[in-house]
Amino acid sequence: MQRPPPEDFSLKETRPHLGGGKLSGDKLTSTYDLVEQMQYLYVRVVKAKELPGKDMTGSCDPYVEVKLGNYKGTTRHFEKKSNPEWNQVFAFSKDRIQASFLEATVKDKDFVKDDLIGRVVFDLNEVPKRVPPDSPLAPQWYRLEDRKGDKVKGELMLAVWFGTQADEAFPEAWHSDAATVSGTDALANIRSKVYLSPKLWYLRVNVIEAQDLIPTDKQRYPEVYVKAIVGNQALRTRVSQSRTINPMWNEDLMFVAAEPFEEPLILSVEDRVAPNKDEVLGRCAIPLQYLDRRFDHKPVNSRWYNLEKHIMVDGEKKETKFASRIHMRICLEGGYHVLDESTHYSSDLRPTAKQLWKPNIGVLELGILNATGLMPMKTKDGRGTTDAYCVAKYGQKWIRTRTIIDSFTPRWNEQYTWEVFDPCTVVTVGVFDNCHLHGGEKIGGAKDSRIGKVRIRLSTLETDRVYTHSYPLLVLHPNGVKKMGEIHLAVRFTCSSLLNMMYMYSQPLLPKMHYIHPLTVSQLDNLRHQATQIVSMRLTRAEPPLRKEVVEYMLDVGSHMWSMRRSKANFFRIMGVLSGLIAVGKWFEQICNWKNPITTVLIHLLFIILVLYPELILPTIFLYLFLIGIWYYRWRPRHPPHMDTRLSHADSAHPDELDEEFDTFPTSRPSDIVRMRYDRLRSIAGRIQTVVGDLATQGERLQSLLSWRDPRATALFVLFCLIAAVILYVTPFQVVALCIGIYALRHPRFRYKLPSVPLNFFRRLPARTDCML
């Protein structure tokens, strides 16, 4: 049986017609755009006046129907209004126009059949063309006609023109491609939008001490701690070591806060009166907008805050003030960058405070052209369909393209730009299937399905070059990796100052505060989780929403979870890094064994020259590296990096390993499967444990050289050191180096297969393995 051909997961270079002109070499012959031009017929329905009444009451409920061939778009209707204003735009794709005339009909909405008020007909051959930066076409009044062509009462203000997707009316227009979508919410869900991430701050709460606390039970020493809450985040200090009514902590609690600040900081001082019972001794609420903002390492002033306590009086909750106070130093940290992405794929590294931002070094332009070969993501009317849209994120700016309805080869041709402040950043483009066009919210909360994702690191791009490639869209499923299609992108990174960009390579990757007052790894993990939750919640509340599953996929939430496949990939990445050293070791072994006598003799000569002229060693090394770099320039990568299934071990992963990777946390699998995976993990951990133990043994043997743990071995080593010191003192260094080098490169005739004396001595040294249980 013939095996099916392997799927093509490679990157392909494309030659699209960008901006109406061909791509010539690395430059554009037309500087219009990074996308292919798409022609549209635009119809702007502005308003009508003096419409005649059609009802028995003498009034009308007018709306406008714009018809072009089989495509039909309608405005909203007004109740009993003879001078309505709509100001709606309709866009018809020129590629799908199969008519010669455009008809705009004003109708009166009725229960049985809508009445005709009048119409305006346009010959498409007479419609003007407009391309920005031309000014918008001014709408005109047109007298309405009946079906016979006779003038009737009423006028309609319209503007009709041919344009491209660069027209400012394009984003808000009704599109003929989406004619099957109805409803205001559904139409809002298919339009292109630009979103901004909320401005995130680190909130530092330094809890110093409290005074004059009043515990209920005065006969015991209080076990007091402070609990702090900001929105959904809750942290607490340790129990104070000074068990008095004046406890001290001097402990930092870190939160993530987003502008505009909606929730206050709520602090409560609590006493642990029993293992599962805590008593509130006082609390206070502090609005975040009034807090100090710190931009450097200088400490802010501390303040005393009064504590309040709620007590029950006659079944009612009443607030009482008393003399208890808490001493704290609270500030919003503007000198840090709030990490909301995976550190490996960061798109922004600037601090929160805008005062600390440096000028941009360039501009990133991204053209999202089209996709091909998309897979069916859902069924509609008994057949597979896909309603695809793209999301791109770089820095604080998110963009969402319009949704192309029911197409496996959608064409977006939308272009976006971002300011670039650091070249060592990544732009992420994701493709999703829109599941909210036909009442998705009502059907059990449908989620937008992921089709694939592309990452492009800006530092891998040449400046001022247009990259046009087709990227494979790969998604990992429990049954293996699957190619969902391809997305065609055009990317250009323009540098405003080459010197400034080169200077960036000498600067720290993160703002200074990350190094002056570093946060712990556990703090960063917790804060990153909170930041992603805040960003996804805020973007979900936008209109139209950028849904939580989309935001989390773009931010790589959950990428830190255990994965056998990813562990194997990382292990082989380490082996790939070490392969160069291993190859050098094998080459040196061949030199020592005289596999190629001519090469070995040349190495002898080179070694003697370097020993006699040691000042040539460093220049020789750096000159060698320079020549290697120049030699490799001919074979430098000419394409951006892309998802590599072989490197990721996605094409060879075992189904059970993939099922484990997609398991929830905590696990939701049956106990027998969990037991099997636990035993497998124990087996792997046992091998790692053995390797770590062997490394520790070698280190302990080095320590035991002078520890007198083995008195004979230490005595021999000390005596050897004394003799070596005397010999090295009276013998020139060059002679010693020559002797050692010639001995290491000696002919196999003078070698023995038994281990050397130093190695035998080292292996006999004691380690602490004897003390292990």
UniProtKB/Swiss-Prot annotation:
UniProt record, GO biological process: shoot apical meristem development
Annotated residues for binding of Ca(2+) 1: 55, 61, 108, 110
One GO molecular-function entry: metal ion binding
Residues annotated to bind Ca(2+) 2: 55, 108, 110, 115
One Gene Ontology CC term in the entry: plasmodesma
Positions of the UniProt region annotated as Disordered: 1-24
Transmembrane segment boundaries: 574-594, 608-628, 716-736
InterPro entries reported in the protein's UniProt record: C2_dom, C2_domain_sf, C2B_MCTP_PRT_plant, C2C_MCTP_PRT_plant, C2D_MCTP_PRT_plant, MCTP_C, QUIRKY-like
Cofactors required: Ca(2+)
Tissue specificity field: Accumulates in vascular tissues, leaf primordia and flowers. Highly expressed in roots meristems and in both vegetative and inflorescence shoot apical meristems (SAMs).
Biased composition (Basic and acidic residues): 1-16
Subunit text: Interacts with and regulates subcellular localization and trafficking of STM.
Name this polypeptide is given: FT-interacting protein 3
Function text: Required for proliferation and differentiation of shoot stem cells in the shoot apical meristem (SAM), thus determining the appropriate balance between the maintenance of shoot stem cells and their differentiation into other aboveground plant parts via the control of subcellular localization and intercellular trafficking of STM in the shoot apex. Prevents intracellular trafficking of STM to the plasma membrane in cells in the peripheral shoot meristem region thus facilitating STM recycling to the nucleus to maintain stem cells.
Designated gene of the protein: FTIP3
Recorded topology in the membrane: Multi-pass membrane protein
Consequences of knocking out this gene: No visible phenotypes. Plants lacking both FTIP3 and FTIP4 have a dwarf and bushy phenotype due to an accelerated stem cell differentiation causing early termination of shoot apices associated with an increased STM localization to the plasma membrane, but compromises nuclear localization.
Originating species: Arabidopsis thaliana
PANTHER family attached to this UniProt entry: FT-INTERACTING PROTEIN 3-RELATED, PHOSPHORIBOSYLANTHRANILATE TRANSFERASE ISOFORM 1
Residue ranges of every copy of the C2 domain listed in the record: 22-142, 181-305, 345-471
Lineage top rank: taxon: Eukaryota
Taxonomic classification: Eukaryota, Viridiplantae, Streptophyta, Embryophyta, Tracheophyta
Gene3D superfamilies assigned: C2 domain (2.60.40.150)
Entry similarity comment: Belongs to the MCTP family.
Alphabetical UniProt keywords: Calcium, Cell membrane, Cytoplasm, Endoplasmic reticulum, Endosome, Glycosyltransferase, Golgi apparatus, Membrane, Metal-binding, Repeat, Transferase, Transmembrane, Transmembrane helix
Localization per record: Endoplasmic reticulum membrane; Cytoplasm; Vesicle; Cell membrane
Major subcellular location class: endoplasmic reticulum
